[in-house]
């Protein structure tokens, strides 16, 4: 009893003095509690009110994060959590992903008659897990935070319980996720033992120096296992097997959410884990990541060409895209690699969510996901066809769209760092990706009458000025995919200020 009281008092003391450092996260927790209270006490489900609470919580959390921006870096909760500009920019990106993803799900959930409260609870909880992962400073938090995110992801991917594909996707996702978590824990145990019992990232480096184990075989084993464990979260080749099935089987708004938030959170965690504990093994992890980047860029873009489903095509496209992001991780902060990675990640969020917004809208109006069924869409809905074309062109990296400038800066930083072969592969695979994106755009714009499928022939044209939340989110993403690329210097300057 005395021990329990002591533990409780210590936890209360930490929350009292360090709680202000996790104020954005506390806002999300309050939003979660409020959703649960309203859902459990109200007989009538007021759908707009639930969305208002969720969106307001996310916007308030973003505001609190921006107000905290200029504060000095701090380590809190007995070393478990670190607050600095680098972590905060990734937390901002995760909150931005969630804020844009919620409008995509409004009409979808109403049409499919899925439970609303639980869906929003899982979105907010996954966001909370991603934010804690960005600031995690010890092995316990690094393990618990992604598990919080992953468990919600499993539940969201299987949210349409009557859909066989959704159930299959959930099982694959769950089994692969459980295996990767166990591999990650095994890697942590090697680092824990080699450093003399340290669990904080910076203390592990000091421990390895004290024990003279920084060049031992145990560190190499830990590096391999951590690369495999984090590889599942980032889904580069060859850890990509789960990605196409989960993308195809999960509800489309869920795929939109997972396709960006998981990449952002895993990139933040991978950057800090590789850069701090494995400081003395930089050549080894650079080589491992280069192999993953090359495999991802080649396999992802090659297999994407053969796909007939839009969601599966975007799954393989995302595998190729993470290969570009890995270039920024390898370059590091010496040649602006982190700044270029963050900038490209920001553009990728808008490009990807904009594309998925178009897919959600088309799927709700036609009930199909097949690429051939998009033939002639421009004749029925020019606005949707043009929006989808702009997002796809930006993903491919055509000037003067944002994706072009993001890739250009990323590749230039890689070239300056001496990664000429890796950048050459990136350039070639980018050209390859433009090919299959242009195939879809040609289908959208020039589909002849005889090629137009019944899905598009019976398509209901949307009004030019719409109050549809999906279309509003789509407009925001399309604008963000085109305009920022022309004036990206301020974005790069802000990103460079985030280096830790």
UniProtKB/Swiss-Prot annotation:
Annotated catalysed reactions: a plastoquinone + NADH + (n+1) H(+)(in) = a plastoquinol + NAD(+) + n H(+)(out); a plastoquinone + NADPH + (n+1) H(+)(in) = a plastoquinol + NADP(+) + n H(+)(out)
GO biological process, one term: ATP synthesis coupled electron transport
Cellular component annotations (GO), alphabetically ordered: chloroplast thylakoid membrane
One protein family per Pfam: Ndh2_N
EC number: 7.1.1.-
Residues annotated as transmembrane: 14-34, 47-67, 89-109, 114-134, 139-159, 173-193, 217-237, 285-305, 313-333, 344-364, 385-405, 408-428, 474-494
Principal place of residence: plastid
KW Protein biosynthesis (keyword) present: no
Keywords: Chloroplast, Membrane, NAD, NADP, Plastid, Plastoquinone, Quinone, Thylakoid, Translocase, Transmembrane, Transmembrane helix, Transport
A GO MF label: NADH dehydrogenase (ubiquinone) activity
Aminoacyl-tRNA synthetase listed as a keyword: no
Places the protein is found: Plastid, Chloroplast thylakoid membrane
Topology of this chain in the membrane: Multi-pass membrane protein
Function: NDH shuttles electrons from NAD(P)H:plastoquinone, via FMN and iron-sulfur (Fe-S) centers, to quinones in the photosynthetic chain and possibly in a chloroplast respiratory chain. The immediate electron acceptor for the enzyme in this species is believed to be plastoquinone. Couples the redox reaction to proton translocation, and thus conserves the redox energy in a proton gradient.
Family: Belongs to the complex I subunit 2 family.
Subunit structure, as described in the record: NDH is composed of at least 16 different subunits, 5 of which are encoded in the nucleus.
Protein name per its UniProtKB record: NAD(P)H-quinone oxidoreductase subunit 2 A, chloroplastic
Gene it is expressed from: ndhB1
């Amino acid at each position: 009893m005395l021990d329990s009281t002591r533990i409780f008092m210590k936890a209360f003391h930490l929350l009292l003095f360090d709680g202000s450092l996790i104020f954005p996260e506390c806002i999300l927790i309050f939003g979660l509690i409020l959703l649960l209270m309203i859902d459990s006490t109200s007989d009538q489900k007021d759908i707009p009110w639930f969305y208002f609470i969720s969106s307001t919580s996310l916007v308030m959390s973003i505001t609190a994060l921006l107000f905290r921006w200029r504060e000095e870096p701090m380590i809190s909760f007995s070393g478990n959590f670190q607050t600095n500009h680098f972590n905060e920019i990734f937390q901002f990106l995760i909150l931005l992903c969630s804020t844009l993803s919620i409008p995509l799900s409004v009409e979808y959930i109403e049409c499919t008659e899925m439970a609303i409260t639980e869906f929003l609870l899982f979105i907010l909880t996954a966001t909370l897990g991603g934010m804690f992962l960005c600031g995690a400073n010890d092995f316990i938090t690094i393990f618990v935070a992604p598990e919080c995110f992953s468990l919600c992801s499993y539940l969201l991917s299987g949210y349409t319980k009557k859909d066989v594909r959704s159930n299959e996707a959930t099982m694959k996702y769950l089994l692969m996720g459980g295996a990767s978590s166990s591999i990650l824990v095994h890697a942590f145990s090697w680092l824990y033992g080699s450093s003399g019992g340290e669990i904080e990232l910076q203390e592990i480096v000091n421990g390895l120096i004290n024990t003279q184990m920084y060049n031992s075989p145990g560190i190499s084993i830990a590096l391999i296992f951590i690369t495999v464990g984090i590889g599942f979260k980032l889904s580069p080749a060859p850890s990509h097997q789960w990605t196409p099935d989960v993308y195809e089987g999960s509800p489309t708004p869920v795929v939109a959410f997972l396709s960006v938030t998981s990449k952002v959170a895993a990139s933040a965690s991978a950057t800090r884990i590789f850069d701090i504990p494995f400081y003395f093994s930089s050549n080894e992890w650079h080589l491992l990541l280069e192999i993953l980047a090359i495999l991802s860029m080649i396999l992802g873009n090659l297999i994407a060409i053969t796909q007939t489903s839009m969601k599966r095509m975007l799954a393989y496209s995302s595998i190729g895209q993470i290969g570009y992001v890995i270039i920024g991780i390898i370059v590091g902060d010496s040649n602006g690699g982190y700044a270029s990675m963050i900038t490209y990640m920001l553009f990728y969020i808008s490009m990807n969510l904009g594309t998925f917004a178009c897919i959600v809208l088309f799927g709700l109006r036609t009930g199909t996901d097949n690429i051939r069924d998009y033939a002639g869409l421009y004749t029925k809905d020019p606005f949707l066809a043009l929006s989808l074309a702009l997002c796809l062109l930006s993903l491919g990296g055509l000037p003067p769209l944002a994706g072009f400038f993001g890739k250009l800066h990323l590749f230039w930083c890689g070239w300056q760092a001496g990664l000429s072969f890796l950048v050459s592969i990136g350039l070639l695979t980018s050209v390859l990706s433009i090919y299959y994106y242009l195939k879809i755009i040609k289908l959208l714009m020039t589909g002849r009458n005889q090629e137009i499928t019944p899905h598009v022939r019976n398509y209901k044209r949307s009004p030019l000025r719409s109050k549809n939340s999906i279309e509003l989110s789509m407009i925001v993403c399309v604008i963000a995919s085109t305009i920022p690329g022309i004036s990206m210097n301020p974005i790069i300057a802000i990103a460079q200020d985030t280096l830790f």
